[in-house]
From Swiss-Prot:
Species name: Alcanivorax borkumensis (strain ATCC 700651 / DSM 11573 / NCIMB 13689 / SK2)
Keywords, in A-Z order: Nucleotidyltransferase, RNA-binding, rRNA processing, Transferase, tRNA processing, tRNA-binding
EC number: 2.7.7.56
NCBIfam families linked: RNasePH (TIGR01966)
Lineage, broadest ranks: Bacteria, Pseudomonadati, Pseudomonadota, Gammaproteobacteria, Oceanospirillales
Official protein name in the record: Ribonuclease PH
Function: Phosphorolytic 3'-5' exoribonuclease that plays an important role in tRNA 3'-end maturation. Removes nucleotide residues following the 3'-CCA terminus of tRNAs; can also add nucleotides to the ends of RNA molecules by using nucleoside diphosphates as substrates, but this may not be physiologically important. Probably plays a role in initiation of 16S rRNA degradation (leading to ribosome degradation) during starvation.
Length: 238
């Protein structure tokens, strides 16, 4: 039995609240159960130096956690003067994941900044950030199209992400903190709307996992991401 009482293949209650803030071209509050992340997509003219003159855009991401998003307060990384390794790893993952869904030529020489700020953490903050940032990105592209700054939609498809793991020898979907902290295997999976894999991150926390368990976890993730993408489509009115 899972601590939450969910079935092994059941997502937490999921929501995408669009236009959550007024200034960003795209903003979404995404909630996976008690994990809540504010995702914004900001558009700026210009690209990094290595892309200047190439007629294509860029997308990058930043990730942070509010000091009291967790059970005990964590100091701000800005106060310490540098980002931690976990933060750098997660924001690179978010950027990689969403770049896979963008036609950079259609974007022109513009940069999209995705900012993912964790308001409340209960496991799965990186996967929630990816799923929420994708919806914010769609709204930013809609802004560019409606203001006639671009002619063609740069989005090649939606992207969803979810965690899976072995909890008490059972494959489970969308781990919360109670499960994640006691999981024998933890895996994060990112996929496109078309069913392609963008990222698979998996590691054994205790005993090694088998090929059969790995296949079961990936199937669980694939089905869960299908549900997440349907929820994104509903939120977007597609």
């Amino acid at each position: 039995m899972r601590p939450s009482g969910r079935a092994p293949d059941q997502l937490r209650e999921l929501s995408f609240t669009r236009n959550y803030t007024v200034h960003a071209e795209g903003s979404v509050l995404v909630a996976f159960g008690n994990t809540k992340v504010l995702c914004t997509a900001s558009v700026e003219d210009g690209v990094p130096r290595f892309l200047k003159g190439k007629g294509q855009g860029w997308l990058t991401a930043e990730y942070s956690m509010l000091p009291r998003s967790t059970h005990t307060r964590s100091g701000r990384e800005a106060t310490r003067g540098k980002q931690g390794g976990r933060t750098l790893e997660i924001q690179r993952l978010i950027g990689r994941s969403l770049r896979a869904a963008v036609d950079m030529k259609a974007l022109g020489e513009r940069t999209i900044y995705l900012d993912c700020d964790v308001l409340q953490a209960d496991g799965g903050t990186r996967t929630a950030s990816i799923s929420g940032a994708c919806v914010a990105l769609v709204d930013a592209f809609t802004y560019l199209l409606e203001t006639k700054k671009i002619k063609n939609d740069p989005l090649t498809g939606l992207v969803g992400a979810v965690s899976v793991g072995m909890y008490k020898d059972t494959p489970v979907l969308d781990l919360d903190y109670a499960e994640d902290s006691n999981a024998g295997t933890d895996m994060n999976v990112v996929m496109t709307q078309q069913g392609g894999f963008i990222e698979i991150q998996g590691s054994a926390e205790g005993a090694p996992f088998t090929r059969e368990q790995s296949d079961n976890l990936l199937e669980l993730a694939e089905n869960g991401i299908g549900e997440i993408i349907k929820a994104q489509q509903v939120a977007l009115g597609w």
